[in-house]
Amino acid sequence: MRALNDSYDVVVVGAGPAGSMASYNASKNGAKTLLIEKSQEIGTPVRCAEAVPRLEDFGINPDPSFVRSYIKGGYLIAPNGKKVVVKGGKTDGYVVERKVFDKFLAIRSGQAGTQIAVKSRVTKIEKTDDGYDVFVNYLGDEYIVKTKIVIAADGVESNIAEYAGLKSKKSSKEICSCAEYEMTNVKLLDNEMMEFYFGDICPKGYIWLFPKGDTVNVGIGIIDSKKRALDYLDEFLTNPLVEGRLDNAVPIEFKVGGDPVGGPIEKTVADNIMVVGDAAGHVSPLTGGGIGLSMACGVMAGEVAAESTKAEDYSEEFLNLYEKRWKERYYKPLMKDLKYKNILQKLSDEELNAIADSIPENLEEVDVGKLAVKIVAKAPSLLRHFKELL
C-alpha cells in the first residue's frame, strides 16, 4: 500500500482545495493521478479564515460534517463605527472546518481513483524529454516518480513552479501577514453575517469576525507593517468598536499564515506543468479570499490534464487551454481587485469614514464603479483616489 508507482499521467503537489480538485477531475476523466501532501494529515495546519463560496456551484453538498455556519452577507465597518450592510448576490456562502473540509475533498479525489501520498515531500523535479522526474521522500523512503504532467498546487511559497522556471515567488509587499484566533463567548452583530473592520487598526488590510457555529474566527490580515499582525489583533480585542462583545472571549485555537495578494503570476503553464491555487496567485488581492477561486481553477487544471493525457500532447501549447480558460473567467476581476486594493491602502481613517457616509447603508451587491460615482458626488475631495474608476 505504501509503495508509489514508477510512473503516472499526472502528479499533483499539494492537497489543499486546489490540488484536491485538480486531482479529482484528472482521475475522474481517466488520468492516472498521484496527489502528494507534505503534512501527515490533510487539512492541517489551518492557515485561513475558512470562508468558502456556495459549494453547490461545485456539485458539492454542504455537509454538516464540515459546514459550521451559513453566511448571508457581511458588515463593512468604518473606523468611526458606521456600518454598511452587504447582502445577497455573491455574498452568501459558508464557514467550514478546514481540517474536515480539505480531508473531504481529498477523500472525494481518492474515491475517483487518485493515489494519495501524505507526509511526503517533493525535494525537486527534473525535466525529461517527455515529462518530469519527481523526487519524493515518502514516509522516509526516497522515490523517483515519472510523470507526463506536474500540477503545482503547493501554496504561496511554491517551489515546484520555480523549479520549472515559472516565477511564483512574491515580495513582502505582495504577502498579507495573517493571524487569527478561533474563540468562544463572542457576541456577533448577527450570527449569519461576517464583520470586516478597516483603518489604522489594521494597516493596509482588515480585521474579520466570521461566525463558525459555537465559535468565531477573529483574525487580521496586514501588509508590510511595522508591527506583527498578532500585536494589532490583540489590540483590537479591546477596541471600542467591539466594546462588550469580546470581554469574555476565550481562544481555543491560534493560526498564522501568509496570503498572496499581489495578483496572479504572469504565466501558469509550461511544457508538462501547470500552476494552480495560491501558488498561481489565485487569490483576490482585495479580500484575500481564494478557496473558491482555487477550487474553480483546480477543476480546470484537472480537466485539461485529462484532455492532455487522452491527446498524448503535454506541450505548453496544449496546456495553455488551462491558462486560457481561467484567465477568460477570472483574470479581469482579479486585476480590478488589485486596483481596488491599491486605492484602499492609500485611504486615511477620515477618508474611510467619508466613504462610509457617502454610500447606502444596505447594498445587495458591490459595484465599485457605481459606488465611486456616489462617493465622489458626496465627497469631492476623494476624487484623486477614484478618478481612474470613473
Curated annotation (Swiss-Prot):
Reactions catalysed according to its record: a 2,3-bis-O-phytanyl-sn-glycerol 1-phospholipid + 8 A = a 2,3-bis-O-(geranylgeranyl)-sn-glycerol 1-phospholipid + 8 AH2; 2,3-bis-O-(phytanyl)-sn-glycerol 1-phosphate + 8 A = 2,3-bis-O-(geranylgeranyl)-sn-glycerol 1-phosphate + 8 AH2; CDP-2,3-bis-O-(geranylgeranyl)-sn-glycerol + 8 AH2 = CDP-2,3-bis-O-(phytanyl)-sn-glycerol + 8 A; archaetidylserine + 8 AH2 = 2,3-bis-O-phytanyl-sn-glycero-3-phospho-L-serine + 8 A
Cofactor(s) listed in the protein's UniProt record: FAD
The protein's annotated pathway: Membrane lipid metabolism; glycerophospholipid metabolism
Keyword Flavoprotein: yes
Cofactor binding mode and count: Binds 1 FAD per subunit.
Enzyme class: oxidoreductase
Gene Ontology biological process terms in this record: glycerophospholipid biosynthetic process; membrane lipid biosynthetic process
Note in the entry: Reduction reaction proceeds via syn addition of hydrogen for double bonds.
Sequence similarity: Belongs to the geranylgeranyl reductase family. DGGGPL reductase subfamily.
Protein known as: Digeranylgeranylglycerophospholipid reductase
Taxonomic lineage of the native organism: Archaea, Methanobacteriati, Methanobacteriota, Methanomada group, Methanococci
